[in-house]
Amino acid sequence: MISAKDFAEKVMEFYVIKRDKRKEKFNVNKLAKSLINSGVNYGDLDTIISEVCAKVYNGITTDELKDIVYNVLKKIDKDVAENYRNGIILKVRTSEKEFESFDKEKIAKALIRETGADEETARKIADEVERELKKLKVKYLTAPMIREIVNYKLIEYGFEELRHKHTRLGMPVYDITKLIKSGSRENANLMYNPESIHKWVADETMKQYALLAIFPKHIADAHIKGDIHLHDLEYAATRPVCLQHDLRPFFKYGLKVDGTGLHTSVSKPAKHPEVAIQHAAKVMMAAQTNMSGGQSIDEFNVWLAPYVRGLSYEKIKQLMQMFIYELNQMYVARGGQSLGRDELIFIKEGDKLKVCKIGEAIDEFMEKYKDKIIVDGDTEILYLDGIAEVYTISVNVKTGKAEFKRVYAISRHKPRGKVYKVIGKDGTSIIVTEDHSLFNYDENGNLVCVKPRQMKHIIRNFNNPYDVEYRIGDYIETNYQRTDSKYNSRQNDIPEKLKITKELCQFLGLFVAEGSYITNGISITTKDDDIAKFIERFVKEQINENIAVKRYEDSVRFVNKGFYRFLKEHINGKAINKNSPEFILKGDKEMKLAFLGGLISGDGYVSKDGRVQIYTTSEQLLGQLHLLLSDLGMIYSITKIKEEGEKIEIKRNEIVRNYKLYVIEIAKNCTEDLKPYVIPKYKKERIKPANYDQLPYDYRIIKEHLRKITDKKPYNDYAWKSNNRKLKLNTLEKIEQLNPHLREEINKFKLNIPFEIKEIKEIDYNGYVYDLSVEDNENFITATGILCHNTIFSSINLELEIPEFLKDKPAVIAGTTRGTYGDYEEEAKLILEALVDVMMEGDAMGKPFLFPNFIIKLRENAFKDENKELMYKIHQLSAKFGIPYFINMLPDWQVTNTNAMGCRTRLSGNWTGDAEIDTLRTGNMQWYSLNLPRIAYEANGDDTKLFEILHERLEILKEALLIKHEVTKERLYVDNLMPFLTQEFDGESYYRYENTTKTFGFVGLNEMLKYHLGEELHESKDAVKFGEKVIEYIREYADKLKEETGLRWTVTQTPAESSLPYDEKILIFENNEYKLVKIGEFVEKYLNRYKDRAITYGDNNIEVYIKDENIYAPSFDKDGKIVLKPITHAIRHRGKEIYEIELESGKKVRVTGDHSVFTINDNLDVVEVKASDLKVGDFIITPKIIPSISKDKIYLSEIVKNKDKYYVKIKDHIKFIEEHEEILKESYKEYKTKWKDLKPVLKKKNAFRLDLIEDLVDKEKIEKISYGHANYINNKIKLDEKFGYLIGAFLSEGHWNDKCVEISSTNKEFIENLVEIIEEILGKDAYYITVKGDKRRYKDLYVIGLNKTVAMIFESLGLNKLSSNKEIPSILLSNETFLKGLIKGYIDGDGSIYVDESKRDYSIRLYTTSETLRDTLCLALKILGINYRLSIDKKSKVNENWRDCYVIKITGKENIEKLLDVEIKNNGGKDVIPKIAEKFKEIINQYSQREWKERFGIDVNNLHIWEDLKKGYMSRYRAKKVLNIMKNVKEIEEKYGRLLDKIGQLIDNDLLFERIKSIRVLDEIPEYVYDISVEGTENFIGGEGFICLHNTAGRFARLDYKYYKEETISVVRGDLNDVDSLYYTNSSHVRVDAPITLGEKVRIEEKFHPLCNGGHIMHIWNIESAADPEVLMDITKKITKTHIGFWTYTKNLSVCNRCGISMGGLRDRCINCGSEDVAKFSRITGYLQNISNWNRAKQKELEDRKLPRI
């Protein structure tokens, strides 16, 4: 610190008196430090200290000293003076959310530690940073902020390498904040971004880590510029790519899913084929988290062959079906099969069994272990190995018994398909995704998986997995220890061990039903004398005779500290958390009966006819009751569930239920056992014996199976004999008695009861769906016993025959060996045939299985007669679905064994010469790719230069691959991150890492040749030869590296992967709010923000990717429904001619001539049409409705957060003061009043400064709010109709200033209504009323004044003062109820209701001079689904200061009735649909009028079709009537069903059809025009009054277009006007639309397969027209005689989601049922996938693909 020598002696002996009267010596250094922390420059320090010290005197107080310093500082720098006065110093907020003083020493130390900087440099930078920070006017600093300034200084001083090492990983604070806010605040039903936040952040961070920390700068730069491509960057630091499995080690030694056996159970070697299948699937699942790419099981059918010997073909097929479903369900679990968030499940950690909502449980784990989450697509997966030992209740489907099984993984994702609610007649229900499997019985009595839509019944398991540990007469520890303290009353004693008696269990049940805790005691609510006597007797006899038991009017109470603590340890307090003690669940039958008896005595109901019901609001107790009742053999139904949010009336007050109430009804024939344990006599007497249950279940599904397996039949049983009667449990018991040997089989059925289904319905669902993965059984039950199945890129390599290298190898089975694999050739063939048959059948709806990839090895015997039938079947599968791949093992360059992945990576047995070592238990470590076209651009026609650049790029790839090799090796063997891979068998690691391939890939050979030679591969032999030369160079380079490094280097083919003017408004959805923005402002904002990622193309066109901003646009989907879709790009084009389109309704939009709007064509399809092609009288589409926002309240304290002068009143404020006293004391320091005097004032007045306490108190606790000293108003405001009315009234007749809000009107009724609403919402103190004379209208003018608090809050809400600028703030464009009230308030204020009975005209008009208010009123009406017309009343000719008045006119019966809650006659409001009258006419003309009358009873003249034909449209109302009439005629429905369905879809969609009034071309051409791109739908809403508008629409190709534009244009594929569609041809393939024969294609591509030893493939595209198995077999036979090594037949597929039919080609409509809900599939790189997920480049390539001539 600086010393002030001139003053040191003078002030050294001075004392300063502190506020607590203590004396402290004046310290110049201390003064200097506080000045520096306040921001004083070092140069001014001496001057300030000198002046202050000159004024200091002995005995000065701290306040006086502070005033002196402040006055001195004020003359130099007012901001610094304020910092000093307010105690603002440089503070740093740490990651732990604590604050600490800034310390530049930490910067210096960090630089030395992280970057290796020398001390002098580090301190120099630290000093510079401190100087910069002093200049900042911020409340606090953050570590990232300081780090960025340090980096800036490092660059300034030329320390680039140090800056590189010091860079912070992650995304900008703004971006992460946006993502988190969207994730936590946005309503899920408003289409929250389907990409996972965790996935986005994790991938971006790991990619940055790879480019900054793994790879040196020159490699990272080469990737970023597009010279090379580093694939899988997000996994560069953690894992290899792919793996070929060998199942033998697991069949011999067993399976450790975690690789160690420490965190999961260890499975013994599989003895049974079912277990072997499960182990095969689990091997894939266990390794998946260790690989970034795919996995394959080589020789799959060979390894499994020994397990199926002696089995029938049907059994083998069933096993293969099980395997395929296992793989697909595991795969889908990472993205498809899941349960709704609120489904109740059992979770056991330690000894505690909890019942919890699956979503809450998984979210809690995910939040706790977020750094361990793995993201696969949009599915988040958390493997629990090494994290937590979690169990759930699962069912062994063989025995039917419930077991505790370990949960090894949990997952969640947003649903991509439909969500169903399955409701049983027993009252249970479950919400599942369309692909989630539940269980049903099949006809053989097996519990099998079925999807929701195929369910015949709901299986509920009634079995308790607990073993009996406690019995009546045992003792249980109370943990009570008596003390000899004189204060210990005898009545507090209880035994140290409490005897378990019937009465104890009854009391526990009674307490769970009606008990609560009081201070050190128990209260049981009851008026029943029997219960009161029972409690007194139990307490005196079994707890302590000295306890005083007191009876009150409605309760019985006693105090005993020991028993109170015992109960608290076992039972929760509140009703919604009540539970059964754990020892009851583990108790014997009598304990459970007694507990239930007590429960029924309290919270049960026994009807006069003997029905017994139990009521509970506790989800925990619901699940435990399921286990208790199950153990007692008592089945039950849930007769009623009172839903959360339901309104109930208590003492004439209506309140909302904030919990569910479950009503459990026990089967009548089970209740008699409970009778001795029920306490009240009247309940006990009502329980009567019954020999029947009343529950809706039925075992008829297994009746035939039972008839087959029973020796002795229960012939005297009516249900057994009759096919119509339900088969019940009593019949099963008779069968069991007659056939004791079937006891286990019958017991399985008794424990798993098939309840009838009441309904399966599709529901709207918000948010994530969830799943568990459970060891062994792969299933779990819900809290009511419903049995659920739980839910990897995979391939299998298959043999038609046992290969030579395996024939003599011992065949492994069940931990030993039996013969050799050569002995099992027939079994291997049967497995292959069964797999083909299963894949051919598809799933339950006939859809193809996407996994595993199906790879057939063709050896020399493939086409022999004995294989002919099987080969035909395989090609049938190719013809039907295009699934199989083929490896050609016949060329000379293929060796003993070769295997492949569907993505083309390949292993061959030529590394060590041992086929097993070279091709099994190893795979591709990584491939990185060359951009070949760019090398050609840079070589500019010079061969020598081309190969020089090629060599340089290969050197870069080599270095990158060597780095990845060492990093992965360290992760495997040093960090032990992948124990499954490194587990040892016979002394050798399972994963043979040293045998993995390091691979050079390449993209765009065809385009390289086109640029370099001027010819493509298919155009000349010279091009092919030069292409071979290039790939040979890469191969020779790789072979040379093998010798140099001793590593395995290979080469592989790599797969390549109109507008509006500036001020036109569009509608967007951001941060859970609708906003109307000018498209130009919107686009320019993001073009400026992301200049570095913007792409320029064509004639000054520029676009930028903004999907990560999480901004949405309302948009219509293929069904005509308005949905919210992400905006992916902001786009700017060079200006063009602008067309202004005005509709008859007054709505307008301005677009360029080539920008499209929407209409319908003669086929009733919605199509786009360019503005320049429109004409007056055409119909275009506008939205009928816009989705509402589920926001039902606001908190005013949140609206004014971070603003001063607001005061609040807090609930339980005295408790709040006590809890936060130290922080409050510090916060209120600036007050002159001392804390000890201020504290009682706060306690008395309950008035806290909001800005001082807002971070300490939850918004729910703030009851009132005030600005300054104005009157308080309510803090929580419901967004209901009344508050909407108030806002509407203000918008129409109100204004505000700095002192108040005023709403005035001459309408007394309007004012009175408003006063009533204000009192209810804001409180009686919020307003005043005055009456003024209105001279203009000779009426009293009533003025409501709202206090200053309301005025300030209106300002914060965005409610403008001036009528010309008013608008509905975005935050208030929310739910329909609020908006309906707003419109009503506006109508009563500044609207009018127009009635003309003679013309049947009934309309509403809203008036405003504000354009923004007009637009937001229109938006509010759209959210309400109300249509309108727009017009303008021109400003007064008398007074030019008057503004134009905008008029919104609402007509239409449905609109007005909806808005005003009135009933009116139809007034012909226009809601019409063009074109459909013509379609109805076509149907009518098929019959004469007489036929219509006589055959169908329809007078067609009454349909008024001819009138509609003249008009060119038909009203929606009439169209619906005509449609219903026609659909009710069976013949018409059968003949024209599809057409009528299409008409119905148009009638029921969210679109309006409005006629064009005028089109004009504007004189002025703007400099720029703008557009946005919307994901999936490619349309958005904009213009005055809202109109639906269309939007315009490989990495290497796009980057080359950016950096080598002219060169790229000459060779690139795709649409130059759509930069995202640009692509290069995959690797060494000929281009997809080359005009050549298949033979020519083979002859070109076969040249490259032997050279690409790390992977290759030939695609035969679009085989739909040649999908004949015989033709494909013939092609296959011919290809095996060439050098093509690996190929597949790709068939484009369309699968109907309604009826399940699969169709060849990419179709928009099902050829079977006419549905347009069609999924389209094709092959990308190597996998069949839904093309909707493809990027534009791949979709463009798909458009270009052609089948070569055969």
Swiss-Prot record:
KW Repeat (keyword) present: yes
GO cellular component terms, semicolon-separated: anaerobic ribonucleoside-triphosphate reductase complex
Domain ATP-cone: 14-101
Keyword Ligase found: no
Keywords: ATP-binding, Autocatalytic cleavage, Nucleotide-binding, Protein splicing, Repeat
DOD-type homing endonuclease domain ranges (all copies): 507-634, 1286-1426
GO molecular function annotations of the record: ATP binding; endonuclease activity; ribonucleoside-triphosphate reductase (thioredoxin) activity
Highest taxon above the source species: Archaea
Listed name of the protein: Uncharacterized protein MJ0832
Organism, as annotated: Methanocaldococcus jannaschii (strain ATCC 43067 / DSM 2661 / JAL-1 / JCM 10045 / NBRC 100440)
